[in-house]
A protein has these predicted regions:
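Sec-dependent signal peptide recognition
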Residues: 2-9
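Generic cytosolic/nucleocytoplasmic N-terminal low-complexity/intrinsically disordered segments
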Residues: 4, 17-19, 187
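Hydrophobic h-region of N-terminal signal peptides that target proteins for export
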Residues: 9-17
Length: 197
């Protein structure tokens, strides 16, 4: 009986140590990503760099691609969609020039990664995704990871989210030929930073 009581805590300690080592490994990968891919390309906002280090990108991609999570490029997330390259996520976030009290609209939730990054920097994030399976998965994951100020919904992002206007900023992760007037009308003030994805 005493041996069983000893073995269970011992196995639990082994599991905890393994999880801690794994998380430390992910943190190192994120540090390298920020230093070599993001800072070197000119992203300077210390808050954006901090959040890019802290947001667990590996949780937002399919498990079989997990080891490539912090690589310098987009990755497939299913349904013919991708998670954006880390540098692009950081750049789009920096271009919003966030102060912390903003309400941001994201067009194209994908796996939820960009919304998670924004969540730590703004008051509220509203994210629309046209692919139902993706938005459903992203909503579950964002909630599980504790991103409570992100609201997601399924729909046509180019129509925006009229019930929640005006927005301080809008990130469009898909590249339309032209910016829909319906989105422009939902901004508090209009300023464009077109960036190739």
């Amino acid at each position: 009986m005493h041996q069983i009581k000893f073995v269970i805590p011992f196995l639990f300690c082994l599991f905890c140590a393994e999880e801690k080592t794994k998380e430390e490994w992910w943190h190192k990968k994120a540090d390298v990503m920020v230093e070599k891919q993001i800072e070197r390309r000119g992203v300077k906002d210390p808050q954006v760099l901090k959040v890019m280090r802290e947001t667990p990108r590996h949780r937002f991609i399919p498990p079989h691609l997990e080891k490539m999570a912090y690589n310098d490029g987009p990755l497939p997330i299913g349904e013919g969609q991708t998670i954006s390259q880390p540098y692009i996520v950081a750049l789009m976030t920096e271009l919003l020039e966030l102060k912390g009290d903003e309400k941001i609209l994201e067009i194209g939730t994908g796996s939820g990664y960009q919304a998670a990054v924004l969540s730590a920097l703004v008051s509220e994030v509203f994210s629309i995704e046209i692919v139902k399976n993706l938005v459903d998965s992203a909503a579950v994951l964002l909630d599980k990871l504790g991103y409570k100020n992100v609201t997601t919904r399924w729909g046509d992002g180019y129509k925006g989210w009229p019930d929640e206007t005006p927005f301080d900023g809008i990130i469009v992760t898909a590249a339309p030929d032209e910016i829909p007037q319906s989105l422009i009308d939902q901004l508090k003030t209009v300023e464009f930073h077109p960036e190739p994805l």
